[in-house]
């Protein structure tokens, strides 16, 4: 039997009609289709699962047909099952789906932004021709969940967006954002995530209202977002009325927008253009960190995956252009009990604790590295298991001059030296467009805002010859070209520059 409430019955139909009649008299509220409580994110795993389910249904139909046609006694799984529908659907999903895209790999920021992109287009979504202003517009529920700045210009404006810095998806695909509760005008240390519907029950204030630091008098009016008269509004209330406060001033914008210093003083349209243009910067040959930053540069570079980070704390034992070796701290090497019959296998292992002889005196002290001589002494004078650990050395390989999806150069350079002590998750090698583990997309050059004989009219700029001579803005681009040599009827094709009846000047020979 179906559980109660799983199917429509007469009472449901009556309830629907009653609500519609009430709405015609102005009683009740209509659901807002653009409210993030009514919109959920379908992740790539869910999209693939739907395609896989379709292919399994096709395969089931083929199996049933074969079972009815062929003799049951002679059937084998190989005869019945044809995996071609599954392979075809998965290939089609990754190869030609509207939501399966070639990763934007111009620089680390473009890669990170592409992975955090949200799209209202695609199968089961909107069509850009049919999408009106309402669905493209910024909604109050986007606050802290979807960036109001970062979106493309043109026909996709508002349909393709970017996750805000602190936004997170819950188990059901709804976007959540973190808040701290306010008690007597002071913010708690505990951080809780709320979706758009949960947030409506509270009065929320942004981080930069300074409530978090407890510096605002309780009677003072502060900016906040509240649910008033059936819709969310940005208004002012006293500190006593505030229930929740944001955890960061960057919470409402995306990673790319948070890299712009003094963003609050920018015009929104220009901020949008600046955010999008950062993703088009090619990695330079000589990088330089920005003089004025926002503090997000380090996190953006590390989270993009282009820099190399150490997995465990330890000491650097070897560095060259292609690899780095780090000896782990002993605490991060697994301890094992070694019985006497396996003592001979312990060459190179380190003792975790002192080992006593049969007489009770200390035979070997802690941190002794075992060799064949010490193992002989152990076999003669010790009969119990010992605790040892193998000090491990991790090797990190660097990517050298490889080609990205957009033909930019991916080259990692070590930034540690032999003997350096490193912590876990510390940057040990720079990638493209990074400097000492920080994102470095451009150069700090002296700029003059002045007319120059009309050469810089409109968007034109005049640059110094030194920028070219000193490789200030030089970048490396790697292109791959393929050519096929086929077997033809007259004979196999040959790739050569010795052209018959052609002079040396044709092929550039001197």
Give residue ranges: language-model regions.
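Short, small/polar residue-rich loop motifs at catalytic or cofactor-binding pockets
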Residues: 142-143, 303, 415
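Short histidine-centered loop motifs in beta-beta connectors
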Residues: 397-423, 510
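Carboxylate/His-rich catalytic cores and anion/metal-binding grooves
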Residues: 312-332, 448-488
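Extended, domain-scale alpha-helical bundle/helix-rich regions
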Residues: 1-138, 147-160, 170, 176-316, ...
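Short hydrophobic beta/alpha edge segments that flank linear recognition/processing sites
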Residues: 154, 323-324, 371, 422-437
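P-loop NTPase nucleotide-binding/switch module
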Residues: 121, 128-130, 135, 399-401, ...
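A structural signal for short beta-strand/turn segments enriched in small hydrophobics and glycine
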Residues: 314, 370, 416-428, 449
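Short, surface-exposed secondary-structure boundary micro-motifs
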Residues: 162, 297, 321, 329, ...
